Regions:
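Short N-terminal edge-element motif at the start of the domain
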Residues: 1-40
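Contiguous surface segments at macromolecular interaction interfaces
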Residues: 27, 32-33, 70-151
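Short glycine/proline-enriched turns and hinge-like loops at secondary-structure junctions
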Residues: 37-39, 54-57
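Short, charged beta-turn/beta-strand-edge "cap" motif at the junction between a beta-strand
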Residues: 48-54
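Short beta-strand-centered aromatic/proline hotspots
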Residues: 56-67
């Protein structure tokens, strides 16, 4: 099992916030290798940066299984994927999280990532576009942050 950080645009987060019955039940992407780049049990932490530059951690998802297309995934979840432009989906293990809002910039600057490449001091959403594998120390720090904010 591996752990990763993934970035969503603030528009994607707002779409989730405004979707009736939304929970982080699945994760979609247009990446060609999306079905094979992860495996059952992988843990994904999601963050976003808003227009004012505030970086927030907003969800985490433990991957359960690759479900395929939007048409194959939508019957399995309690909300519509009609406005979501992705071609492939992973389902998350239950219970599914709702959104949380945890300040993340200070901690993000300390993350080593498996690559050993830290974020630059003045990072923005462009620096977070690539899905990054986390170290076990990174995961521990993120979990401690989540615990401090939401228990």
């Amino acid at each position: 099992m591996a752990s990763y950080h993934a970035y969503w645009t603030v528009d994607n987060v707002r779409m989730a916030e405004n979707t009736p019955n939304w929970s982080h039940a699945c994760w979609g992407s247009k990446l060609r290798n999306f079905s094979t780049m992860f495996e059952h049990g992988d843990l994904i932490y999601f963050s976003t940066i808003d227009e004012s530059g505030r970086h927030s951690l907003f969800s985490k998802l433990v991957l359960d299984r690759f479900t395929g297309t939007r048409e194959q995934t939508e019957p399995l979840i309690p909300f519509s994927l009609t406005n979501v432009p992705f071609d492939a989906y992973w389902m998350g293990k239950k219970p599914w999280n709702t959104l949380f809002d945890i300040p993340f910039r200070e901690l993000a600057l300390t993350l080593d990532f498996a690559s050993g490449k830290k974020l630059p001091p003045n990072y923005n959403g462009q620096n977070l576009q690539k899905i990054r594998e986390l170290t076990s120390e990174d995961v521990l720090a993120i979990e401690e942050l989540i615990e401090a904010y939401i228990g």
